[in-house]
Protein backbone atom coordinates (compact mmCIF):
# COMPACT_ATOMS: atom_id res chain seq x y z
CA UNK A 1 0.00 0.00 0.00
CA UNK A 2 3.01 2.31 0.36
CA UNK A 3 6.44 2.75 -1.14
CA UNK A 4 8.11 4.58 1.76
CA UNK A 5 7.84 5.49 5.41
CA UNK A 6 7.70 9.22 6.06
CA UNK A 7 11.29 9.32 7.32
CA UNK A 8 12.41 7.85 4.01
CA UNK A 9 11.32 10.95 2.11
CA UNK A 10 14.22 13.22 1.15
CA UNK A 11 15.55 15.52 -1.57
CA UNK A 12 17.05 12.62 -3.51
CA UNK A 13 13.53 11.45 -4.37
CA UNK A 14 12.40 14.76 -5.90
CA UNK A 15 10.52 14.09 -9.13
CA UNK A 16 9.64 10.51 -8.20
CA UNK A 17 6.16 9.15 -7.56
CA UNK A 18 5.76 7.82 -4.02
CA UNK A 19 2.89 6.43 -1.98
CA UNK A 20 2.58 7.10 1.75
CA UNK A 21 0.14 5.83 4.38
CA UNK A 22 -0.59 7.31 7.77
CA UNK A 23 -2.70 9.65 9.86
CA UNK A 24 -3.62 13.26 9.19
CA UNK A 25 -1.97 15.07 12.06
CA UNK A 26 -2.95 18.56 10.92
CA UNK A 27 -4.97 20.02 8.02
CA UNK A 28 -4.65 23.64 6.87
CA UNK A 29 -6.60 25.40 4.12
CA UNK A 30 -4.55 28.27 2.68
CA UNK A 31 -6.59 30.11 0.09
CA UNK A 32 -7.71 27.11 -1.88
CA UNK A 33 -4.59 24.99 -1.43
CA UNK A 34 -4.91 22.38 1.33
CA UNK A 35 -1.91 21.24 3.36
CA UNK A 36 -1.95 18.02 5.41
CA UNK A 37 0.80 16.87 7.76
CA UNK A 38 0.80 13.11 7.27
CA UNK A 39 2.21 11.10 10.18
CA UNK A 40 3.30 7.50 10.39
CA UNK A 41 5.44 5.61 12.87
CA UNK A 42 8.63 7.08 11.45
CA UNK A 43 7.87 10.76 10.95
CA UNK A 44 5.94 13.52 9.16
CA UNK A 45 5.59 14.63 5.54
CA UNK A 46 3.71 17.66 4.24
CA UNK A 47 1.04 16.80 1.66
CA UNK A 48 -0.16 19.50 -0.76
CA UNK A 49 -3.55 19.15 -2.45
CA UNK A 50 -4.03 21.58 -5.35
CA UNK A 51 -7.50 22.35 -6.78
CA UNK A 52 -6.46 21.12 -10.24
CA UNK A 53 -6.25 17.59 -8.83
CA UNK A 54 -10.02 17.44 -8.40
CA UNK A 55 -10.45 14.07 -6.68
CA UNK A 56 -7.42 14.47 -4.42
CA UNK A 57 -8.50 17.99 -3.49
CA UNK A 58 -12.03 16.79 -2.65
CA UNK A 59 -10.63 14.06 -0.39
CA UNK A 60 -8.29 16.58 1.28
CA UNK A 61 -11.21 18.93 1.81
CA UNK A 62 -13.12 16.11 3.50
CA UNK A 63 -10.14 15.03 5.61
CA UNK A 64 -10.02 15.83 9.32
CA UNK A 65 -7.57 15.22 12.17
CA UNK A 66 -6.54 11.55 12.59
CA UNK A 67 -8.22 10.35 9.39
CA UNK A 68 -6.28 7.40 7.96
CA UNK A 69 -4.98 8.20 4.48
CA UNK A 70 -3.17 6.70 1.53
CA UNK A 71 -1.53 9.43 -0.56
CA UNK A 72 0.13 9.03 -3.95
CA UNK A 73 1.93 11.85 -5.67
CA UNK A 74 5.14 13.34 -6.99
CA UNK A 75 7.74 14.60 -4.52
CA UNK A 76 8.87 18.17 -5.07
CA UNK A 77 11.02 20.78 -3.33
CA UNK A 78 9.22 23.20 -1.09
CA UNK A 79 9.12 26.78 -2.35
CA UNK A 80 12.00 28.92 -1.10
CA UNK A 81 11.29 30.34 2.34
CA UNK A 82 8.75 27.65 3.29
CA UNK A 83 11.23 24.96 4.34
CA UNK A 84 10.81 23.54 7.84
CA UNK A 85 14.22 22.88 9.45
CA UNK A 86 12.54 21.09 12.37
CA UNK A 87 11.34 18.22 10.14
CA UNK A 88 13.69 15.68 8.48
CA UNK A 89 11.47 15.98 5.40
CA UNK A 90 11.19 19.74 5.80
CA UNK A 91 12.76 20.61 2.43
CA UNK A 92 10.26 18.62 0.37
CA UNK A 93 6.52 18.11 0.02
CA UNK A 94 4.30 15.58 -1.71
CA UNK A 95 2.03 16.99 -4.43
CA UNK A 96 -0.99 14.72 -4.09
CA UNK A 97 -2.31 13.12 -7.27
CA UNK A 98 -4.53 10.72 -5.36
CA UNK A 99 -5.76 10.75 -1.75
CA UNK A 100 -7.68 7.77 -0.48
CA UNK A 101 -9.46 7.97 2.88
CA UNK A 102 -8.90 4.52 4.39
CA UNK A 103 -10.78 5.31 7.59
CA UNK A 104 -12.32 8.20 9.44
CA UNK A 105 -11.84 9.35 13.01
CA UNK A 106 -14.08 11.01 15.52
CA UNK A 107 -12.61 14.10 17.21
CA UNK A 108 -9.93 12.80 19.58
CA UNK A 109 -10.43 13.36 23.34
CA UNK A 110 -7.12 15.23 23.64
CA UNK A 111 -4.73 16.92 21.19
CA UNK A 112 -1.98 14.45 20.35
CA UNK A 113 0.61 17.21 19.99
CA UNK A 114 0.13 18.52 23.54
CA UNK A 115 2.40 17.47 26.41
CA UNK A 116 0.33 18.35 29.48
CA UNK A 117 -2.40 15.70 29.25
CA UNK A 118 -4.04 14.15 32.32
CA UNK A 119 -2.59 10.68 32.84
CA UNK A 120 -5.98 9.08 33.46
CA UNK A 121 -7.14 10.33 30.06
CA UNK A 122 -3.97 9.04 28.41
CA UNK A 123 -4.42 5.60 29.98
CA UNK A 124 -8.11 5.37 29.06
CA UNK A 125 -7.29 6.11 25.41
CA UNK A 126 -3.87 4.48 25.41
CA UNK A 127 -4.09 3.54 21.72
CA UNK A 128 -4.27 7.27 20.96
CA UNK A 129 -1.59 8.19 23.49
CA UNK A 130 0.77 5.73 21.80
CA UNK A 131 0.41 7.60 18.51
CA UNK A 132 2.38 10.48 20.02
CA UNK A 133 6.02 10.50 18.83
CA UNK A 134 7.29 10.65 22.42
CA UNK A 135 5.52 7.39 23.30
CA UNK A 136 6.55 5.70 20.06
CA UNK A 137 10.16 6.68 20.81
CA UNK A 138 9.94 5.07 24.25
CA UNK A 139 8.59 1.79 22.91
CA UNK A 140 11.26 1.71 20.22
CA UNK A 141 13.94 2.39 22.82
CA UNK A 142 12.55 -0.50 24.87
CA UNK A 143 12.85 -2.72 21.80
CA UNK A 144 16.41 -1.50 21.29
CA UNK A 145 17.25 -2.46 24.89
CA UNK A 146 15.82 -5.98 24.65
CA UNK A 147 17.47 -6.55 21.27
CA UNK A 148 20.86 -5.52 22.68
CA UNK A 149 20.43 -7.65 25.81
CA UNK A 150 19.46 -10.73 23.82
CA UNK A 151 22.42 -10.28 21.50
CA UNK A 152 24.86 -9.79 24.37
CA UNK A 153 23.66 -12.81 26.33
CA UNK A 154 23.43 -15.00 23.22
CA UNK A 155 27.05 -14.18 22.41
CA UNK A 156 28.04 -14.94 26.02
CA UNK A 157 26.66 -18.48 25.74
CA UNK A 158 23.38 -17.99 27.59
CA UNK A 159 20.29 -19.90 26.46
CA UNK A 160 16.83 -18.31 26.43
CA UNK A 161 14.43 -20.65 28.23
CA UNK A 162 10.79 -19.96 29.13
CA UNK A 163 9.62 -20.93 32.61
CA UNK A 164 6.01 -21.52 33.73
CA UNK A 165 3.54 -18.70 34.26
CA UNK A 166 1.16 -20.98 36.15
CA UNK A 167 2.98 -22.36 39.19
CA UNK A 168 2.38 -22.96 42.89
CA UNK A 169 2.25 -20.27 45.54
CA UNK A 170 5.49 -19.83 47.48
CA UNK A 171 6.35 -17.07 49.96
CA UNK A 172 8.69 -14.58 48.24
CA UNK A 173 7.95 -11.41 50.19
CA UNK A 174 4.84 -10.12 48.42
CA UNK A 175 1.32 -11.41 47.89
CA UNK A 176 0.78 -13.79 44.99
CA UNK A 177 -1.81 -13.39 42.28
CA UNK A 178 -3.83 -16.59 42.58
CA UNK A 179 -5.51 -18.48 39.73
CA UNK A 180 -8.17 -21.01 40.80
CA UNK A 181 -8.05 -24.43 39.16
CA UNK A 182 -11.29 -25.62 37.55
CA UNK A 183 -10.09 -29.20 37.21
CA UNK A 184 -8.88 -29.43 40.82
CA UNK A 185 -11.46 -27.53 42.90
CA UNK A 186 -10.06 -25.79 45.96
CA UNK A 187 -6.57 -25.67 44.49
CA UNK A 188 -4.83 -22.64 43.07
CA UNK A 189 -2.03 -21.74 40.74
CA UNK A 190 -0.01 -18.60 41.41
CA UNK A 191 1.45 -16.21 38.88
CA UNK A 192 5.23 -16.10 39.47
CA UNK A 193 6.79 -13.22 41.38
CA UNK A 194 10.00 -14.24 39.64
CA UNK A 195 11.36 -17.35 37.89
CA UNK A 196 13.67 -17.86 40.89
CA UNK A 197 13.07 -21.53 41.67
CA UNK A 198 12.75 -22.64 38.07
CA UNK A 199 16.01 -21.01 37.03
CA UNK A 200 17.73 -22.76 39.93
CA UNK A 201 16.25 -26.04 38.74
CA UNK A 202 17.61 -25.32 35.26
CA UNK A 203 21.06 -25.06 36.83
CA UNK A 204 20.51 -28.44 38.51
CA UNK A 205 19.52 -29.71 35.06
CA UNK A 206 22.91 -28.72 33.69
CA UNK A 207 21.79 -25.87 31.42
CA UNK A 208 24.79 -23.90 32.77
CA UNK A 209 23.79 -20.46 31.43
CA UNK A 210 20.19 -19.29 31.24
CA UNK A 211 18.40 -16.04 30.55
CA UNK A 212 14.85 -14.93 29.97
CA UNK A 213 13.03 -11.64 29.46
CA UNK A 214 9.87 -12.46 31.32
CA UNK A 215 6.75 -11.14 33.00
CA UNK A 216 6.56 -11.26 36.80
CA UNK A 217 3.58 -10.55 39.04
CA UNK A 218 3.27 -9.12 42.55
CA UNK A 219 0.08 -8.15 44.34
CA UNK A 220 1.50 -5.29 46.38
CA UNK A 221 0.91 -1.63 47.10
CA UNK A 222 2.09 0.38 44.12
CA UNK A 223 4.46 3.33 43.85
CA UNK A 224 5.70 5.34 40.91
CA UNK A 225 8.26 2.63 40.11
CA UNK A 226 6.06 -0.45 40.59
CA UNK A 227 3.45 -2.34 38.57
CA UNK A 228 1.47 -5.48 39.43
CA UNK A 229 2.96 -7.06 36.29
CA UNK A 230 6.46 -6.09 35.28
CA UNK A 231 9.23 -7.34 33.02
CA UNK A 232 12.49 -8.77 34.26
CA UNK A 233 15.76 -9.56 32.50
CA UNK A 234 16.53 -12.78 34.35
CA UNK A 235 20.02 -14.31 34.31
CA UNK A 236 21.50 -17.40 36.00
CA UNK A 237 24.76 -19.32 35.58
CA UNK A 238 26.49 -22.35 37.09
CA UNK A 239 30.00 -22.59 38.52
CA UNK A 240 30.20 -18.86 39.23
CA UNK A 241 30.91 -16.62 42.19
CA UNK A 242 29.96 -12.99 42.82
CA UNK A 243 32.81 -11.67 40.70
CA UNK A 244 31.76 -13.77 37.72
CA UNK A 245 28.12 -12.68 37.88
CA UNK A 246 28.96 -9.01 38.26
CA UNK A 247 31.63 -9.41 35.61
CA UNK A 248 28.97 -10.61 33.16
CA UNK A 249 26.31 -8.04 34.03
CA UNK A 250 28.49 -4.94 34.25
CA UNK A 251 29.80 -4.98 30.66
CA UNK A 252 26.25 -5.61 29.46
CA UNK A 253 24.98 -2.44 31.15
CA UNK A 254 28.03 -0.49 30.05
CA UNK A 255 27.56 -1.64 26.46
CA UNK A 256 23.83 -0.94 26.60
CA UNK A 257 24.36 2.69 27.59
CA UNK A 258 26.98 3.12 24.88
CA UNK A 259 24.64 1.58 22.29
CA UNK A 260 21.45 3.42 23.24
CA UNK A 261 22.68 6.77 24.56
CA UNK A 262 26.27 6.99 23.40
CA UNK A 263 27.27 7.31 27.06
CA UNK A 264 30.47 5.83 28.50
CA UNK A 265 29.85 4.56 32.03
CA UNK A 266 32.85 4.13 34.36
CA UNK A 267 34.96 1.00 34.05
CA UNK A 268 34.82 -0.63 36.52
CA UNK A 269 31.71 0.42 38.40
CA UNK A 270 32.50 1.52 41.97
CA UNK A 271 31.52 -0.79 44.82
CA UNK A 272 30.24 -0.09 48.30
CA UNK A 273 29.13 -2.32 51.15
CA UNK A 274 25.58 -2.14 52.45
CA UNK A 275 26.91 -1.03 55.83
CA UNK A 276 28.88 1.84 54.30
CA UNK A 277 25.91 2.94 52.17
CA UNK A 278 23.57 3.06 55.16
CA UNK A 279 26.15 4.86 57.30
CA UNK A 280 26.95 7.53 54.71
CA UNK A 281 23.67 7.93 52.86
CA UNK A 282 20.92 6.33 54.96
CA UNK A 283 19.73 4.18 52.04
CA UNK A 284 21.00 1.07 50.25
CA UNK A 285 20.42 2.63 46.83
CA UNK A 286 22.45 5.87 47.05
CA UNK A 287 22.40 8.44 44.29
CA UNK A 288 26.10 9.21 43.97
CA UNK A 289 25.39 12.33 41.93
CA UNK A 290 24.33 13.80 45.27
CA UNK A 291 27.32 15.17 47.25
CA UNK A 292 25.47 15.26 50.60
CA UNK A 293 26.36 12.68 53.27
CA UNK A 294 25.20 11.86 56.79
CA UNK A 295 27.51 12.49 59.74
CA UNK A 296 27.54 10.03 62.65
CA UNK A 297 26.88 11.65 66.06
CA UNK A 298 25.57 8.77 68.19
CA UNK A 299 28.69 8.50 70.36
CA UNK A 300 28.64 12.27 71.04
CA UNK A 301 25.09 12.29 72.33
CA UNK A 302 25.19 9.60 75.02
CA UNK A 303 26.24 12.12 77.69
CA UNK A 304 24.28 15.24 76.71
CA UNK A 305 21.33 16.58 78.68
CA UNK A 306 19.16 17.00 75.59
CA UNK A 307 16.78 14.11 76.16
CA UNK A 308 15.72 13.60 72.53
CA UNK A 309 19.30 13.01 71.40
CA UNK A 310 20.51 11.18 74.52
CA UNK A 311 17.71 8.60 74.61
CA UNK A 312 18.12 7.82 70.93
CA UNK A 313 21.88 7.39 71.39
CA UNK A 314 21.45 5.10 74.41
CA UNK A 315 18.92 2.69 72.91
CA UNK A 316 20.35 -0.59 71.49
CA UNK A 317 19.53 0.13 67.85
CA UNK A 318 19.40 3.91 68.05
CA UNK A 319 21.19 6.47 65.97
CA UNK A 320 21.81 10.21 65.99
CA UNK A 321 23.11 11.72 62.77
CA UNK A 322 23.06 14.99 60.89
CA UNK A 323 22.86 16.06 57.27
CA UNK A 324 24.86 19.13 56.24
CA UNK A 325 23.36 21.21 53.43
CA UNK A 326 25.85 23.74 51.99
CA UNK A 327 24.25 27.18 51.69
CA UNK A 328 21.16 25.90 53.46
CA UNK A 329 21.08 28.71 56.02
CA UNK A 330 19.09 30.66 53.45
CA UNK A 331 16.17 28.24 53.77
CA UNK A 332 13.02 29.88 55.11
CA UNK A 333 11.10 28.60 58.09
CA UNK A 334 8.33 27.52 55.71
CA UNK A 335 10.81 25.42 53.74
CA UNK A 336 12.17 23.86 56.93
CA UNK A 337 8.63 23.08 58.07
CA UNK A 338 7.96 21.41 54.71
CA UNK A 339 11.05 19.23 55.19
CA UNK A 340 9.87 18.39 58.71
CA UNK A 341 6.57 17.17 57.31
CA UNK A 342 8.44 15.22 54.64
CA UNK A 343 10.56 13.32 57.17
CA UNK A 344 7.42 12.52 59.17
CA UNK A 345 6.40 10.26 56.27
CA UNK A 346 9.31 8.02 57.28
CA UNK A 347 8.48 7.98 60.99
CA UNK A 348 10.55 10.93 62.21
CA UNK A 349 8.92 12.70 65.16
CA UNK A 350 10.58 16.00 64.33
CA UNK A 351 13.46 17.55 62.42
CA UNK A 352 15.93 19.49 64.55
CA UNK A 353 18.19 21.95 62.74
CA UNK A 354 21.04 24.39 63.25
CA UNK A 355 21.84 27.26 60.90
CA UNK A 356 25.55 28.11 60.80
CA UNK A 357 25.70 31.88 60.38
CA UNK A 358 29.35 32.22 61.45
CA UNK A 359 32.06 29.83 62.63
CA UNK A 360 34.20 32.30 64.59
CA UNK A 361 31.52 33.44 67.04
CA UNK A 362 30.98 30.24 69.03
CA UNK A 363 27.37 29.55 69.95
CA UNK A 364 26.49 33.11 68.97
CA UNK A 365 27.14 32.20 65.36
CA UNK A 366 24.59 29.39 65.47
CA UNK A 367 20.85 29.82 65.05
CA UNK A 368 18.59 27.06 66.35
CA UNK A 369 16.07 26.21 69.08
CA UNK A 370 18.32 23.32 70.22
CA UNK A 371 21.66 25.16 70.62
CA UNK A 372 20.91 26.01 74.26
CA UNK A 373 20.55 22.30 75.10
CA UNK A 374 23.95 21.23 73.79
CA UNK A 375 27.39 21.95 75.36
CA UNK A 376 29.70 24.18 73.36
CA UNK A 377 32.25 21.36 73.11
CA UNK A 378 29.63 19.06 71.55
CA UNK A 379 28.51 21.77 69.14
CA UNK A 380 32.10 22.39 68.13
CA UNK A 381 32.61 18.68 67.43
CA UNK A 382 29.38 18.51 65.38
CA UNK A 383 30.65 21.36 63.22
CA UNK A 384 34.06 19.73 62.85
CA UNK A 385 32.75 16.28 61.92
CA UNK A 386 30.20 17.57 59.45
CA UNK A 387 32.62 19.99 57.81
CA UNK A 388 30.16 22.83 58.32
CA UNK A 389 30.90 26.27 56.91
CA UNK A 390 29.24 29.63 57.33
CA UNK A 391 25.94 29.67 55.46
CA UNK A 392 25.22 25.95 55.95
CA UNK A 393 22.34 24.25 57.74
CA UNK A 394 22.48 20.97 59.65
CA UNK A 395 19.41 18.72 59.88
CA UNK A 396 19.34 16.14 62.68
CA UNK A 397 17.75 12.74 63.06
CA UNK A 398 17.49 10.96 66.42
CA UNK A 399 15.53 7.71 66.76
CA UNK A 400 16.00 4.08 65.82
CA UNK A 401 18.66 3.65 63.16
CA UNK A 402 15.94 2.50 60.75
CA UNK A 403 13.88 5.68 61.15
CA UNK A 404 16.92 8.00 61.11
CA UNK A 405 18.29 6.35 57.98
CA UNK A 406 14.99 6.46 56.13
CA UNK A 407 14.18 10.03 57.18
CA UNK A 408 17.60 11.60 56.55
CA UNK A 409 18.35 9.37 53.56
CA UNK A 410 15.21 10.46 51.76
CA UNK A 411 15.62 14.06 52.94
CA UNK A 412 19.09 14.00 51.38
CA UNK A 413 17.55 13.18 48.00
CA UNK A 414 14.75 15.71 48.38
CA UNK A 415 17.06 18.59 49.35
CA UNK A 416 19.53 17.83 46.56
CA UNK A 417 16.73 17.86 43.99
CA UNK A 418 15.21 21.07 45.39
CA UNK A 419 18.51 22.95 45.51
CA UNK A 420 19.97 21.60 42.25
CA UNK A 421 22.91 19.86 43.91
CA UNK A 422 23.12 16.78 41.67
CA UNK A 423 26.49 16.50 39.94
CA UNK A 424 27.09 14.44 36.79
CA UNK A 425 24.69 12.44 34.66
CA UNK A 426 25.12 8.70 35.35
CA UNK A 427 26.59 7.22 38.54
CA UNK A 428 26.35 3.42 38.86
CA UNK A 429 27.47 1.59 42.00
CA UNK A 430 27.41 -2.02 43.18
CA UNK A 431 26.11 -2.51 46.72
CA UNK A 432 27.47 -5.68 48.35
CA UNK A 433 27.54 -7.54 51.67
CA UNK A 434 23.85 -7.23 52.48
CA UNK A 435 22.53 -8.65 55.74
CA UNK A 436 21.01 -12.10 55.29
CA UNK A 437 17.99 -11.25 57.43
CA UNK A 438 15.85 -8.34 58.55
CA UNK A 439 13.87 -8.45 61.78
CA UNK A 440 10.14 -7.89 61.36
CA UNK A 441 8.91 -6.26 64.58
CA UNK A 442 5.25 -6.75 63.67
CA UNK A 443 5.62 -10.49 63.05
CA UNK A 444 8.36 -10.88 65.70
CA UNK A 445 10.58 -12.98 63.45
CA UNK A 446 13.47 -12.82 61.02
CA UNK A 447 12.71 -12.41 57.32
CA UNK A 448 14.95 -12.72 54.26
CA UNK A 449 16.48 -9.46 53.10
CA UNK A 450 16.36 -10.77 49.53
CA UNK A 451 14.84 -14.28 49.40
CA UNK A 452 15.39 -17.52 51.33
CA UNK A 453 17.53 -19.09 48.58
CA UNK A 454 20.38 -16.57 48.92
CA UNK A 455 23.61 -18.13 50.15
CA UNK A 456 25.18 -16.77 53.35
CA UNK A 457 28.82 -15.77 53.33
CA UNK A 458 30.97 -18.74 54.26
CA UNK A 459 32.20 -17.32 57.58
CA UNK A 460 28.61 -16.97 58.82
CA UNK A 461 27.43 -20.50 57.99
CA UNK A 462 28.02 -21.91 61.45
CA UNK A 463 26.40 -19.02 63.35
CA UNK A 464 23.20 -18.63 61.33
CA UNK A 465 21.03 -20.09 64.06
CA UNK A 466 22.67 -18.34 67.03
CA UNK A 467 23.34 -14.93 65.47
CA UNK A 468 21.16 -14.35 62.38
CA UNK A 469 21.28 -10.57 62.80
CA UNK A 470 24.99 -10.40 61.97
CA UNK A 471 24.97 -12.87 59.08
CA UNK A 472 25.90 -11.41 55.71
CA UNK A 473 24.62 -12.62 52.35
CA UNK A 474 26.41 -13.29 49.09
CA UNK A 475 24.12 -10.72 47.51
CA UNK A 476 24.67 -7.67 45.32
CA UNK A 477 22.53 -4.89 43.85
CA UNK A 478 23.33 -2.55 40.99
CA UNK A 479 22.18 0.99 41.71
CA UNK A 480 22.04 3.78 39.15
CA UNK A 481 21.29 7.38 40.16
CA UNK A 482 19.47 6.21 43.28
CA UNK A 483 17.47 3.51 41.49
CA UNK A 484 18.00 -0.18 42.05
CA UNK A 485 18.07 -1.46 38.48
CA UNK A 486 19.19 -4.99 39.24
CA UNK A 487 20.05 -7.37 41.99
CA UNK A 488 20.99 -10.95 42.65
CA UNK A 489 22.99 -13.38 44.70
CA UNK A 490 24.87 -16.61 44.82
CA UNK A 491 22.29 -19.30 45.61
CA UNK A 492 22.26 -22.10 48.13
CA UNK A 493 23.11 -25.36 46.35
CA UNK A 494 23.40 -27.69 49.35
CA UNK A 495 20.35 -29.00 51.19
CA UNK A 496 21.96 -28.76 54.64
CA UNK A 497 22.63 -25.05 54.17
CA UNK A 498 19.12 -24.48 52.82
CA UNK A 499 17.68 -26.17 55.90
CA UNK A 500 19.76 -23.90 58.17
CA UNK A 501 18.42 -20.81 56.42
CA UNK A 502 14.85 -22.09 56.64
CA UNK A 503 15.36 -22.75 60.36
CA UNK A 504 16.67 -19.21 60.93
CA UNK A 505 13.52 -17.93 59.22
CA UNK A 506 11.31 -20.03 61.45
CA UNK A 507 10.34 -22.37 58.60
CA UNK A 508 10.16 -25.86 60.01
CA UNK A 509 11.04 -29.06 58.16
CA UNK A 510 7.40 -29.92 57.48
CA UNK A 511 6.55 -26.45 56.16
CA UNK A 512 9.72 -26.39 54.05
CA UNK A 513 8.87 -29.78 52.59
CA UNK A 514 5.30 -28.66 51.85
CA UNK A 515 6.30 -25.41 50.12
CA UNK A 516 9.69 -26.21 48.61
CA UNK A 517 9.85 -29.99 48.48
CA UNK A 518 10.60 -30.04 44.76
CA UNK A 519 13.62 -27.76 45.29
CA UNK A 520 14.91 -29.72 48.27
CA UNK A 521 14.58 -32.93 46.26
CA UNK A 522 16.55 -31.38 43.39
CA UNK A 523 19.37 -30.46 45.77
CA UNK A 524 19.85 -34.21 46.40
CA UNK A 525 21.01 -34.78 42.85
CA UNK A 526 24.24 -32.90 42.41
CA UNK A 527 23.21 -29.25 42.26
CA UNK A 528 26.17 -27.15 41.05
CA UNK A 529 27.24 -23.89 42.68
CA UNK A 530 25.26 -21.21 40.88
CA UNK A 531 24.12 -17.62 41.04
CA UNK A 532 22.61 -14.86 39.00
CA UNK A 533 20.73 -11.63 39.01
CA UNK A 534 17.78 -9.89 37.42
CA UNK A 535 17.31 -6.42 35.98
CA UNK A 536 14.01 -4.57 36.02
CA UNK A 537 13.50 -3.83 32.32
CA UNK A 538 10.78 -1.24 32.90
CA UNK A 539 12.86 0.78 35.34
CA UNK A 540 15.95 0.53 33.17
CA UNK A 541 14.08 1.86 30.12
CA UNK A 542 12.50 4.59 32.26
CA UNK A 543 15.96 5.87 33.19
CA UNK A 544 17.33 5.59 29.67
CA UNK A 545 14.57 7.70 28.15
CA UNK A 546 14.14 10.12 31.06
CA UNK A 547 10.52 9.19 31.79
CA UNK A 548 9.01 10.03 35.17
CA UNK A 549 7.37 6.65 35.86
CA UNK A 550 7.56 3.15 34.44
CA UNK A 551 3.97 3.61 33.28
CA UNK A 552 5.42 5.78 30.52
CA UNK A 553 7.55 2.95 29.11
CA UNK A 554 4.95 0.15 29.21
CA UNK A 555 2.53 -0.10 26.30
CA UNK A 556 -0.54 -0.87 28.42
CA UNK A 557 0.25 -0.21 32.11
CA UNK A 558 -1.93 -0.46 35.17
CA UNK A 559 -2.77 2.49 37.41
CA UNK A 560 -1.46 2.89 40.95
CA UNK A 561 -4.63 1.09 42.04
CA UNK A 562 -3.64 -1.90 39.88
CA UNK A 563 -6.42 -1.29 37.38
CA UNK A 564 -6.54 -0.85 33.62
CA UNK A 565 -8.52 2.22 32.57
CA UNK A 566 -8.55 1.03 28.96
CA UNK A 567 -10.13 -2.41 29.46
CA UNK A 568 -11.62 -1.67 32.90
CA UNK A 569 -9.81 -4.70 34.32
CA UNK A 570 -10.14 -6.22 36.82
CA UNK A 571 -13.79 -6.93 36.14
CA UNK A 572 -16.55 -9.12 37.45
CA UNK A 573 -17.26 -12.53 35.93
CA UNK A 574 -20.44 -14.48 35.36
CA UNK A 575 -21.88 -16.56 38.19
CA UNK A 576 -21.51 -19.66 36.02
CA UNK A 577 -17.74 -19.15 35.84
CA UNK A 578 -17.53 -18.80 39.62
CA UNK A 579 -19.61 -21.93 40.13
CA UNK A 580 -17.33 -23.91 37.82
CA UNK A 581 -14.40 -22.83 39.98
CA UNK A 582 -16.18 -23.59 43.25
CA UNK A 583 -15.97 -19.95 44.34
CA UNK A 584 -18.63 -18.12 46.33
CA UNK A 585 -18.39 -14.35 46.87
CA UNK A 586 -19.06 -12.89 50.29
CA UNK A 587 -22.07 -10.52 50.44
CA UNK A 588 -21.10 -7.08 49.16
CA UNK A 589 -17.85 -8.21 47.54
CA UNK A 590 -17.57 -7.07 43.94
CA UNK A 591 -20.57 -4.77 44.17
CA UNK A 592 -23.08 -7.51 43.55
CA UNK A 593 -25.09 -10.29 45.11
CA UNK A 594 -23.09 -13.46 45.78
CA UNK A 595 -23.82 -16.42 43.56
CA UNK A 596 -26.02 -19.14 45.04
UniProtKB/Swiss-Prot annotation:
Name of the protein in its database record: Aspartate--tRNA(Asp/Asn) ligase
Region called Aspartate, residue ranges: 196-199
Top-level taxon of origin: Bacteria
Residues the record lists as binding L-aspartate: 172, 218, 450, 491
Gene3D superfamilies registered for this protein in UniProt: Bira Bifunctional Protein, Domain 2, GAD-like domain, Nucleic acid-binding proteins
Free-text function comment from the UniProt entry: Aspartyl-tRNA synthetase with relaxed tRNA specificity since it is able to aspartylate not only its cognate tRNA(Asp) but also tRNA(Asn). Reaction proceeds in two steps: L-aspartate is first activated by ATP to form Asp-AMP and then transferred to the acceptor end of tRNA(Asp/Asn).
Reactions listed under catalytic activity: tRNA(Asx) + L-aspartate + ATP = L-aspartyl-tRNA(Asx) + AMP + diphosphate
Claim: Protease is one of the keywords in the record: no
Cellular component annotations (GO), alphabetically ordered: cytoplasm
InterPro entries, sorted: Aa-tRNA-synt_II (IPR004364), aa-tRNA-synth_II (IPR006195), aa-tRNA-synth_II/BPL/LPL (IPR045864), Asp-tRNA-ligase_1 (IPR004524), Asp-tRNA-ligase_1_N (IPR047089), Asp/Asn-tRNA-synth_IIb (IPR002312), AspRS_core (IPR047090), GAD-like_sf (IPR004115)
Amino acid sequence: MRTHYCNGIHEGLIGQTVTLCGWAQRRRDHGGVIFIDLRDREGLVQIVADPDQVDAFAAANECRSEFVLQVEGVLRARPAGTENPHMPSGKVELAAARIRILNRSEPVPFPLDEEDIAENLRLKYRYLDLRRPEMLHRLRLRHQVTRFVRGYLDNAGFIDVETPVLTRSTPEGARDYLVPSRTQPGHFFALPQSPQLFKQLLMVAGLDRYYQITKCFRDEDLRADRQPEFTQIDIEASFVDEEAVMGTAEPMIRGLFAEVLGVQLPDPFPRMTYRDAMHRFGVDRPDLRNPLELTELTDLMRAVDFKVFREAAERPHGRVACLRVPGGAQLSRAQIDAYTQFTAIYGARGLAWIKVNALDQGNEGLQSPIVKFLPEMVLSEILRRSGAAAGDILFFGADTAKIVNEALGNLRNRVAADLGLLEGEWCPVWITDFPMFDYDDKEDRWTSTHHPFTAPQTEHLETLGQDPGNALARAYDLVLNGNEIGGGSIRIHQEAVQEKVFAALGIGAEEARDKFGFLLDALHYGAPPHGGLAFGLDRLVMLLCGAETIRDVIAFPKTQKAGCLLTEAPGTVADKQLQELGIRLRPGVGGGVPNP
